[in-house]
């Protein structure tokens, strides 16, 4: 008698070029998720002299637009009859529009305060729209390329691997260029162009390399946003999973928005953001295979529990940087980085399994509808993270300035920076565990990574 789950292997393996080429798209998703969250709020408050609360709104509102545009892009992609399939043409449209728009965000005319915030907000909104056109179909593709959960895991492995490369490159490159000439508008303009080149390489690479991917099984598009939300409510596992990841993405977004302030005002050097990112991303590359192995042996939900608890512990430890010195801060970020490796891989694996289970249970393919809602929630959470951190700055009396006139910060603002980087993300991550517990209790979700016996290679 064949082993349970062996029918998964009847699906043909994807060409290696497709798996690797698909992963290239994460050079876009990782970069666009990292650089605005890391740089944009600081650029507004410390280069363009925008008050913290106004800067937070300029970062948050354009990304909040994704709550509307992402599900619409998902439905449009589901209904698409474009030549090249329902997904890849959207990848090409995004690749042609996002890189130049991103460069323009940091090419502001000589403005200060509210006018500068308005310029950045408009360009950021346009860039967020272009990103949605690329990201929603991109995230959908693994669930449609193959029925084999192990093959989906391989595809996602390349995606998350390139995600780590993107975060490392952009997280180190963008601040290094921006700070090279003393945080001047010119240095930020050069940084925007360099990051735009990285975006273009990943986006065009993913579009070209997935030409040989299997024809996507068309999802059924829900006719309206209300219908899409109703579809999501019909899938309890998806609701719990999306809620869990939204809280965790918010925690990551808050921490990401604060890391440049933490480097400048807690560690005492704007350039300290580079070793901080090395502590964060080094474990991402090294520990991702270990998280994948743990998921195979113990189950993906068990591994997600471990990653979530470790992230919470690392965030709590970060609060003791002032008392213990920079070494404590760097050690805490290493723990967060180890956890972050799992949080980048495991929720995506759980999402792909949940989408496949929904299709098998309902007989309907709603992958793009669900991923549109997923990416909208994720993007909103990351954007809200910057907005929440900006509110912490405003509430604690942070003083904005331009590149030529730096100012000293009050003690309350320095305390707020540390708390916003540590205590607040820890609370959000702890709250996500309740939803993860509910997801684990949902009987309709099966995890083939855990249930299928190991096979010899």
Residue map of PLM features:
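Membrane-embedded alpha-helical bundles of multi-pass transporters/translocases
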Residues: 2-457
């Amino acid at each position: 008698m064949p082993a349970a789950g062996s029918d998964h292997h009847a699906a043909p393996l994807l060409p290696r070029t497709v798996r690797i080429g698909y992963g290239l798209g994460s050079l876009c998703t990782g970069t666009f998720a990292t650089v605005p969250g890391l740089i944009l709020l600081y650029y507004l408050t410390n280069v363009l002299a925008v008050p913290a609360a106004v800067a937070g709104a300029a970062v948050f509102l354009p990304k909040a637009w994704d709550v509307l545009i992402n599900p619409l892009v998902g439905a449009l992609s589901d209904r698409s009859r474009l030549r090249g399939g329902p997904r890849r043409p959207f990848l090409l449209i995004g690749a042609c529009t996002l890189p130049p728009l991103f460069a323009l965000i940091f090419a502001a005319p000589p403005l200060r305060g509210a006018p500068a915030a308005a310029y950045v907000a408009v360009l950021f909104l346009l860039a967020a729209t272009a990103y949605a056109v690329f990201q929603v179909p991109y995230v959908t593709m693994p669930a449609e390329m193959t029925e084999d959960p192990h093959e989906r895991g391989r595809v996602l492995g390349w995606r998350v691997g390139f995600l780590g490369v993107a975060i490392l490159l952009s997280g180190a490159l963008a601040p290094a260029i921006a700070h090279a000439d003393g945080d001047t508008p010119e240095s930020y303009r050069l940084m925007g162009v360099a990051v735009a080149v990285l975006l273009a390489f990943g986006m065009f690479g993913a579009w070209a390399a997935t030409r040989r991917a299997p024809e996507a099984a068309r999802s059924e598009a829900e006719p309206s946003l209300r219908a899409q939300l109703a579809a999501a409510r019909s899938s309890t596992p998806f609701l719990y999973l999306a809620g869990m990841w939204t809280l965790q993405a918010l925690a990551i977004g808050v921490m990401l928005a604060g890391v440049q302030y933490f480097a400048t005002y807690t560690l005492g050097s704007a350039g300290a953001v580079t070793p901080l990112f090395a502590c964060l991303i080094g474990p991402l590359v090294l520990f991702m295979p270990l998280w994948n192995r743990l998921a195979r042996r113990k189950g993906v939900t068990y591994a997600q529990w471990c990653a979530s608890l470790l992230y919470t512990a690392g965030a709590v430890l970060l609060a003791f940087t002032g008392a213990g010195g920079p070494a404590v801060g760097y050690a805490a970020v290493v723990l967060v980085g180890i956890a972050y490796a799992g949080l980048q891989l495991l929720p995506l694996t759980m999402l792909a399994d949940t989408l496949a289970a929904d299709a098998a249970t309902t007989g309907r393919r709603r992958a793009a509808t669900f991923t549109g809602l997923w990416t909208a929630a994720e993007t909103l959470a990351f954007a809200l993270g910057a907005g929440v951190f900006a509110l912490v700055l405003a509430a604690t009396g942070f003083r904005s300035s331009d590149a030529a006139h730096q100012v000293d910060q009050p003690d309350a603002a320095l305390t707020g920076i540390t708390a916003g980087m540590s205590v607040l993300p820890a609370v959000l991550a702890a709250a996500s565990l309740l939803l993860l517990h509910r997801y684990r209790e949902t009987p309709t979700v099966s995890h083939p990574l855990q249930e299928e016996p190991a096979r010899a290679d």
